[in-house]
């Protein structure tokens, strides 16, 4: 069975175990991501999306595409400009295509939440205030 998903402003035709490169998706290698914008599953066409359909995928790697050079030259003006751009891409492997609100066999990992809690715990501990020097001078003057 195949599905058409929408991510990064583009549409991709995917099937189970497909390996595709899409625009950057948040996550590290090994994370599970879910695509809820499923436009078509098999012969079922959504309007605009198929209700209850979900595609899960595993992030294989985060990479960058080839460099695209934007070169502009104004003839006879001694004026030119060169700029380069490398698009960030994510390689994903499609795990499952689910329909009718079925639950994925692997849950999407939420690793970022514990890291944020640990950072908040460290930030919540106030540092001890330095002793006031003005008070120390006042005591020595007496």
From Swiss-Prot:
One of its GO terms (biological process) is translation. Residues 107-125 have a biased composition (Basic and acidic residues). InterPro entries: bL21-like, bL21-like_sf, Ribosomal_bL21. Residues 73-84, 126-135 have a biased composition (Basic residues). Residues 73-142 are annotated as: Disordered. GO terms for cellular component: cytoplasm; ribonucleoprotein complex; ribosome. The keyword DNA damage does not apply. Keywords: Ribonucleoprotein, Ribosomal protein, RNA-binding, rRNA-binding. One of its GO terms (molecular function) is rRNA binding. The keyword rRNA-binding applies. Part of the 50S ribosomal subunit. Contacts protein L20. NCBIfam families: L21. PANTHER family: 50S RIBOSOMAL PROTEIN L21, LARGE RIBOSOMAL SUBUNIT PROTEIN BL21M. Belongs to the bacterial ribosomal protein bL21 family. This protein binds to 23S rRNA in the presence of protein L20. This is Large ribosomal subunit protein bL21.
